Amino acid sequence: MSDTHPSQTTPRDAADSVATLSAPFPTMPGFAELGERFFTRLRPTPLPSAYLVSVAPNAAALLGMPVEAASEPDFIEAFVGNSVPDWADPLATVYSGHQFGVWAGQLGDGRAIRLAQAQTDTGPWEIQLKGAGLTPYSRMADGRAVLRSSIREYLCSEAMAALGVPTTRALSIIGSDAPVRRETIETAAVVTRLAPTFIRFGHFEHFAAHEDVAALRQLADFVINNFMPACREAAQPYQALLREVSLRTADMVAHWQAIGFCHGVMNTDNMSILGLTIDYGPFGFLDAFDANHICNHSDTQGRYAYSQQPQVAFWNLHCLAQALLPLWLEPGADEAARDGAVAQAREALDPFRDRYASEFFRHYRAKLGIHMPAGGDKEDEPLLTSLFQLLHEQHVDYTLFWRNLARISSADGSGDAPVRDLFLDRAAWDTWAESYRNRLRAEQSDDAARRVAMLAVNPKYVLRNHLAEIAIRRAREKDFSEVDRLLAVLSRPFDEQPEAEAYAALPPDWAGGLEVSCSS
């Protein structure tokens, strides 16, 4: 949906302009029903010379929106924030949070403006413009996002959805020639994001920090009523809410680990109450396997390293539990009552570790093409532990390993070359492969059926940093064809796509010098 000579629009007066873009969906108040202590109504700040970079067909389908609409000037005007459709109710929400383990106070929305809440056949979708300008919560920032980070978020949102990972979605990128100062001067862009809700742990932390229990209760009730109605039937609805968020978060992080995804900045304000992957910043997919991989060069202590993600998620859930504690307490509650509330919160969080472990083993059994053993998950630990140690020591490409593993034979090593050649120490591979083959033979594995099943869960294509970088470099020259091409490939990550073989290759040597940070 983009070309090398994009159409451009000139912003009208943001205070008065109304876009004529019609909506193929009804809207509802959504977050706006909470009232203005939770948000500020405002209009986006216009961007000059706006042009379409790309639109995601699968995300557009969620809204029932024809992709062809993206070529219309009114689409660009509305989704860059230059004008406000009559169906929109733009607002910025307020939240706080912990950053790198330290309380940081009020954080946002610093540059994201909710445009509307759509109600479609696929469910409720909050439509949000990221990079749409200053809000009352911007602190010292400029309210903008840059083309570089916008392309990364856009592509990864849709790639993760295609991989089956819980995630926010991305409808479009609209760029501008307006300069934005980061580590260097870059150009601005706006990503239109979609999610049932963008409520974060940090929304609850904000009102807990301000001791506004009424607002905290109202927010919790809103989440329960709209997204987790089963919690209403529980004896302790708020405890049930915390438990449900804990389970969803465990599922999400287990899936991250299985596909080799490193988020990079798991602050509590970047944690979705629905257990969605949110805020794609300095993320990365593993190339050579390194259990301690740090994808964010701003993370000097490795707090958010790949191996630390499950523990950090649990720590963040404790922050959410702390914020929700007042909902279990009556005014003037004594120490015994508080101890009881803490015990209830711990009880709600207790299932996290077991759920994470269960999902972790489920994903990896599927990746290995093996079944649950009679002895349960514990029986699989030696096979997996020895594999992870081998991958780590040999710096084996994570995605290529799993994809090629599907092709080996359970009978002998005659077909091992595609995966065996990834190892410097071939003898070490041979030793592990024999234990793996023994497992396959014990299960009387049918190689053809196993291969089909493994190829359906081990992607051939992921958003490696160098692929995103190539698309970004071309986009800076107003050539957006690589963004669209990469989006199309990543939308079918498990398919062979012979014409896209280059996107599945090992990273080039120059990719090792790429760094991503919180600068976006």
Curated annotation (Swiss-Prot):
Stored HAMAP family:
YdiU_SelO (MF_00692)
**What is the protein name for this chain?**
Protein nucleotidyltransferase YdiU
- Which residues does the entry assign to the active site, renumbered to this chain? D269 (proton acceptor)
What is the species of this protein?
Cupriavidus pinatubonensis (strain JMP 134 / LMG 1197) (Cupriavidus necator (strain JMP 134))
Entry keyword set? ATP-binding, Magnesium, Manganese, Metal-binding, Nucleotide-binding, Nucleotidyltransferase, Transferase
Q: Which GO terms describe its molecular function?
A: AMPylase activity; ATP binding; magnesium ion binding
- The enzyme's E.C. designation: 2.7.7.-, 2.7.7.108
Q: Which InterPro entries match?
A: SelO
Q: Which cofactor does it need?
A: Mg(2+); Mn(2+)
Q: Which Pfam families match?
A: SelO (PF02696)
Q: Which residues bind ATP?
A: G108, G110, R111, K130, D142, G143, R193, R200, D279
Kindly state which reaction or reactions the protein catalyses.
L-seryl-[protein] + ATP = 3-O-(5'-adenylyl)-L-seryl-[protein] + diphosphate; L-threonyl-[protein] + ATP = 3-O-(5'-adenylyl)-L-threonyl-[protein] + diphosphate; L-tyrosyl-[protein] + ATP = O-(5'-adenylyl)-L-tyrosyl-[protein] + diphosphate; L-histidyl-[protein] + UTP = N(tele)-(5'-uridylyl)-L-histidyl-[protein] + diphosphate
Family classification = Belongs to the SELO family.
Q: Tell me the superkingdom of the source.
A: Bacteria
Q: What does this protein do?
A: Nucleotidyltransferase involved in the post-translational modification of proteins. It can catalyze the addition of adenosine monophosphate (AMP) or uridine monophosphate (UMP) to a protein, resulting in modifications known as AMPylation and UMPylation.
